[in-house]
Amino acid sequence: MEELKKIAVIGAGIMGTGIAEVCARGGYDVALVDISEEILQRAKERIRKSMERAVERGKMSKEEMEKALGRIKFTTNLEEAARDADLVIEAIPENMELKKQLFKRLDEICPERTIFATNTSSLMITDLASATKRPDRFIGMHWFNPAPVMKLIEVIRGALTSDDTFNFIVELSKKLGKVPVEAQDGPGFFTTRFIVAVLAEAIRLFEQGIAGIKEIDTMVKLGFNWPMGPFELADFVGLDTIYHVLEYVYNETGNPAYKPPLILRKLVLAGYLGDPRQKPGSRGGFYEYFKIPRER
C-alpha cells in the first residue's frame, strides 16, 4: 500500500462527518471540507459526541480521542484541503452533475498521485470518472451509515480503475477496521439496488392498503430480525435520497421495481425529507406525515 499521510473528505454531512471520524481514529490527518462554517461546526460537534460515546463504551481512551480530534482540520477552502492530499473521499449530495463538477475541479487542484474515491451509493463510477483525467485512480468506496459503526465498505471499480487503486482502497478499508467487499459497476451496484427495491415495495404495499406503516415495520423487525423496519429506515436514510436513487436506477434500467411510488414523490415535494434528527430542516418523514409516534 502506498504511503498515505493526508485524506481530504469533501462534504460534512452525516456520511462525510462519519468518514472523517473513522479516518482520524485510524491515525490519518484529515481535512473535512464543506461550503459553510455553520455546517462544519455541526460536524465538529457530531464527531466529538460520537467519540465521547466511544470513550464511554471503552472503545478508545480520552487521550486517543483528543489526538484523533486534533488530526481533523475543518475548512471551507477546497484548494487548501485537497492540494496535498494523497486520497480524496467525496461525500457530497447524490447528484451526477454536482459530483462531476467537483471532480473536474479536484483534478485541477490535486497532484497526479492523488486517488479519488466517491461515496456514491448509486451513480456509475465509470461515468463519474469521465470528468477526470485519472480514471485509473478513481474508485467507488461506498460507506454505510453510521460510518463509525457499520463494518461494510462496498468497493466498486470503474471500467478503467487500476489494480493498484483497487488494492489500495481494499487495504485501507481493512486498516480502518472495515470489511471491503467488491461489487461491479452499474446503477446502484448491489447494496443500493437491493435495499431501495425493498423500500419501494414496502411503500407500494402501504399505498395498496395491504398493511399500515407501523405494522409493516413491526413485521419486518420481528419476522426477519431487521434492526429497523423499511419506513424507519427510509426516514433514517432520507426520503429525498431514496427518491432520487430510485429515479436514477429506474431511468437507467427501465425495471419497474425501481419506479418511485407516488406517495414518496408527494412527501419529498412537500418538504418531508426524513427524520428531522438526521435531516436538518426536514418537516419529518413517513412517521411525522402520518402522525405515528416514533420509538425513541
Residue ranges of each PLM-predicted region?
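Rossmann-fold dinucleotide-binding core
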Residues: 115-184, 192-193
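Acidic/polar active-site rim loop that often engages polyanionic ligands
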Residues: 28, 83, 146-155, 227-228, ...
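NAD(P)-dependent Rossmann-like dehydrogenase/reductase catalytic/cofactor-binding core
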Residues: 2-3, 26-28, 167, 174-185, ...
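Rossmann-like NAD(P)-binding element
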Residues: 35, 39-42, 55-116, 123
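Helix N-cap / loop-to-helix initiation motif
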Residues: 3, 36, 61, 162, ...
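Amphipathic alpha-helical segments at domain termini/boundaries
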Residues: 7, 25, 68-87, 168, ...
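Hydrophobic/aromatic beta-strand patches that form the interior of the parallel beta-sheet core
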Residues: 31, 73-75, 89, 139, ...
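NAD(P)+-binding Rossmann beta1-loop-alpha1 motif at the extreme N-terminus of oxidoreductases
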Residues: 1-53, 57, 109
